[in-house]
Amino acid sequence: MEALYLGNLNTVEFNLNLPKKGKYGSEIHWISGHERFLDTEGNVRRPAYGTGDRIISLWAEFFYKGVSETKEYKVCILEEKPKIEVTKVEPLQKKAQAGETTYLPYVAVIHTTEGKTLVHRILWENGAKRCYGQTGGFEERGELDGLSVPVSCTVTVEKELRKEKKGTEPLIEYFDHGEASLEEGSRFYTAQKEMQEFLLQTDDDQMLYNFREACGLDRKGAEPMTGWDAPECNLKGHTTGHYLSGLALCYKAGKDGRIREKACYMIRELGKCQDAFACMPGIGEGFLSGYTEEQFDKLEKYTPYPDIWAPYYTLHKILAGLLDCYEFAGIDQAFEVAQKLGMWVYRRLSVLPVEQRMKMWGMYIAGEYGGMNDVLARLYRMSGKKEFLETACYFDNEKLFLPLEQQVDALENLHANQHIPQIIGAMEIFRGTGEKMYYDIASYFWEAVTKAHVYTIGGTGENEMFHGPGRIGSLLTKHTAESCASYNMLKLTKELYRFENQKERMDYYERTMTNHILGGREHGTTGETVYFTPLAPGFHKEFEHENSCCHGTGLESHFKYADMVYAHEGQKLYVNLFLKSRLEWKDAGITIRQMTEMEHPETVVLEVESREEFPMAVRIPGWSGEERGLWIDGKKQDTMSVESGYLCMTVPEGVHEIRCLFPCGFYLESTPDRPELHSLLYGPYVLAALSKEERFLKLDIDPGKAEQEAEKDGLTFCYRGLVWKPLFEIDREPFQVYWEKV
């Protein structure tokens, strides 16, 4: 039964392959919960546009030697794409250089009669490729594909095209290479230690199974991987990439030599696999994956999913894992393997026409490429080889980038976690090129998502997809807030804060890290992470052991908690997160021990030792009240300096205790589209009511009265006859985050 894998059942658009025989000889009979949408032959009929997605129960009955057993699968069938009536097309403008080949925009932003803002493909007269022999203005004409709506683009041709630049020197530097570390006594520390135990008990040879199998090396008796990494699955290899990153980040966080030994073994063996691939006919030098080049060949012929499954997505995970092992665990061979693999990508893509690459990246799931632009631009930054930066730009996705350039939110119907890594890549390309456009689209994307597409826990997306701006209360289902989307939003937030230390970015970071990332792990050492955090009433977290994308990012997330606690701008130190932690800033001669208790987020306690005085800024959290206090060595400071949302001070040389008080209490947040739906928060924590009720609870909650009436035990509250807990305290109990205020 466990050997049977049906593919990603969360976003089904195509027919399923439902086998009649199991891998080991069992007979399989299929039963569908709704044959109108999914029959027992695997034929899929998508719901009409506007009627919503359908989650269908599918049962497999296994019969073997007189024994039978049944397994249920949940299949989410996506509704049909809309029939579009256009009311407006956003104007298109482009600059080009005389005598150089350029391409007209492949897409336009459109507005529809249903109030939607979407991106639609353009068919240009005489194609998209242009080369203008003289300077001046030109008007190009085309139409929206399949809609016969006219489109025009104004092209300004200049003698020499100058791209607007922005400085690439970071304003902020992080302590994210082990200088900051967690200290015992918090849920964050527990999560880090338990994930470390999971990594220590993981079989390295099993993680290498698919790679050795593909290149013909001995599998050393290891069992095959399962789930999304099963031998029959086309995404196999992605978890191994996450595992490499997890080992590297774990070593950075705790300096456990056993973890580094595992990472060294993995890199040595993957190096052998890379060498073995190079000796195989039809395999290019430097190639490395959990399968041969066949999926890449098929992608270039536009083979759809599920015949192939995102080969460049898997490659991104492998490359990222290699670079993490080099940067955070100091394994030089990992850098060598990564550069060889990067050159393989360059040689493969540099010979493809622009039109072909655009069509590949536009293919649903098959063309998904994770953060290939990110990892290749990072490889350029680390190696200085311009081929890697050039290749990173091959992954520019105009369908995503163009509306963001125009400062238009056209995210609806985009697969959230497919596109967030591409924006992280835009930031990395900005660091390599200095082109302001890449920075601007990343900044606008962050603003659009965090202002109009996030739930109260910081997570985004329903059924993996972005929906219309402000659609939150109408999309509270079992399939909300994909974990790896938040993982990537935090990565993006980190990169943006590096260049503009906006306090609001750290407010979002704290909210999402605390309530979604920490709240998404299974308690104990299973290593599991929820795929979705269900925000419909009465559901519980589901931990699936199938090597999903969210399992992969979960291998990494819990080793990043200390990375953003502290930062510095020159000699000025920022305290951004309030976790029990320690900082050793050796260059400045500063040591900080933070003793903030999670049960008392209102009191930030810092023990500071410094060889000379220095400026320090402590973030004033978005959840705190107007009144605040500052004590240095027990003496209350009568005056406090507040700048850009930070409590600023000069810390004298020597050893001192700094105590900051930020009033903390209950408060409510409502959803923009259904203002009667609320969530209850206490300081940085989103509180969930323990309840099996699958209808929204109707509650009369006044935050001021709750302060007086709620019974508090640690971070557990009893109020209105209900038990309320932060999400990270809840494991498998059913709960409600949102409820109806009466």
What are these regions (language model features)?
Residues 29-61, 114-159:
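Serine/threonine-rich, repeat-prone extracellular segments and beta-strand-based repeat modules
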Residues 1-29, 82-116:
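Solvent-exposed, low-complexity, repeat-rich "mucin-like" stalks and linkers
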Residues 160-239, 264-298:
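Low-complexity, Ser/Thr/Pro/Gly-enriched N-terminal "stalk/linker" regions
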Residues 175-185, 251-264, 278, 322-339, ...:
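Structural helix-adjacent loops and short alpha-helical linkers that scaffold large soluble proteins
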Residues 625-650, 668-673:
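Solvent-exposed beta-strand/loop surfaces of large extracellular or lumenal domains
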Residues 224-240, 299-314, 350-369, 401-436, ...:
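Solvent-exposed loop and edge beta-strand segments that line ligand/cofactor-binding
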Residues 442, 506-606, 642, 661-742:
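C-terminal beta-rich recognition modules with glycine/proline-rich loops and embedded aromatic residues
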Residues 188, 243-257, 316-332, 371-384, ...:
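Well-ordered alpha-helical scaffold segments within catalytic/enzyme domains
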